[in-house]
Amino acid sequence: MSELDAREIIEMIAKAKKKTPIVAYIKGDLAGIDFSSFKFFGDERFGILFGEYEDFKKLLEEHREKIEDYHLEVKARNSALPLADLTKYKARIEPGAIIRDMVEIGEGAVIMMGAVINVGAVIGEGTMIDMNAVVGGRAIIGKKCHIGAGAVIAGVIEPPSAKPVVIEDEVLVGANAVILEGVTVGKGAVVAAGAVVTKDVPPYTVVAGVPARVIKQIDEKTKEKTKIVDELRNLE
């Protein structure tokens, strides 16, 4: 998948038919009711419907006397873009991760519980996005990186002129660190936990603080402490 331009994404969102997907569980005299607007599973007494809220609202109004009870689950409201089809990725994606459509995830990547990845983002092969990390729209993360729990990689869809975050290969971003719009983090760098990165990070350096600054070059001790564990990326 090629890198998405911000204006392309904005145009897609603006022109997309907004959807309010629902799952409805209904009980009653269902014989003779037209469920063609939904994906329907059930019989003449009980059914499960997958479809749009407005269609269900209309169904209720037309057949109120036949429907004895129902339970409604609303998955989103006026949503412009769907979530990704997770089956297309050769990656480990844990329950509770939220991944929008048009996200590229490389083979062997790991997306942990609660991680959020927005439209147009690119996640490289073997990279781990840890729990509750946020990868914003159009952010580009290289291969064999680790994005720590609670970290925020800023997105740049609005304003459309902004440059996306680029994190090169083999970078470790500590827990709760923030990488701001337009920043490039060089290959092999380490961003300390809690750091706020406002400018480019040179390759093979360690940055820390608010705002982040270079505190040292990568040495053997740092390499050992920040080593990527390949076994965690095994899909078999």
From Swiss-Prot:
Molecular function (Gene Ontology), one example: tetrahydrodipicolinate N-acetyltransferase activity
PANTHER family according to UniProt: 2,3,4,5-TETRAHYDROPYRIDINE-2,6-DICARBOXYLATE N-ACETYLTRANSFERASE, ACETYLTRANSFERASE
Pathway(s) annotated for this protein in UniProt: Amino-acid biosynthesis; L-lysine biosynthesis via DAP pathway; LL-2,6-diaminopimelate from (S)-tetrahydrodipicolinate (acetylase route): step 1/3
Gene name in the database record: dapH
Catalysed transformations (reactions): (S)-2,3,4,5-tetrahydrodipicolinate + acetyl-CoA + H2O = L-2-acetamido-6-oxoheptanedioate + CoA
Pfam family, one: DapH_N
Job description of the protein: Catalyzes the transfer of an acetyl group from acetyl-CoA to tetrahydrodipicolinate.
Enzyme Commission number: 2.3.1.89
GO BP: diaminopimelate biosynthetic process; lysine biosynthetic process via diaminopimelate
The name this protein goes by in its record: 2,3,4,5-tetrahydropyridine-2,6-dicarboxylate N-acetyltransferase
Keywords: Acyltransferase, Amino-acid biosynthesis, Diaminopimelate biosynthesis, Lysine biosynthesis, Repeat, Transferase
InterPro entries reported for this sequence: DapH, DapH_N, Hexapep, Hexapep_transf_CS, Trans_hexapeptide_repeat, Trimer_LpxA-like_sf
UniProt record similarity statement: Belongs to the transferase hexapeptide repeat family. DapH subfamily.
HAMAP family: DapH
Membrane spanning stretches: none
Species this protein is from: Thermotoga maritima (strain ATCC 43589 / DSM 3109 / JCM 10099 / NBRC 100826 / MSB8)
Enzyme class: transferase
PROSITE patterns recorded: HEXAPEP_TRANSFERASES
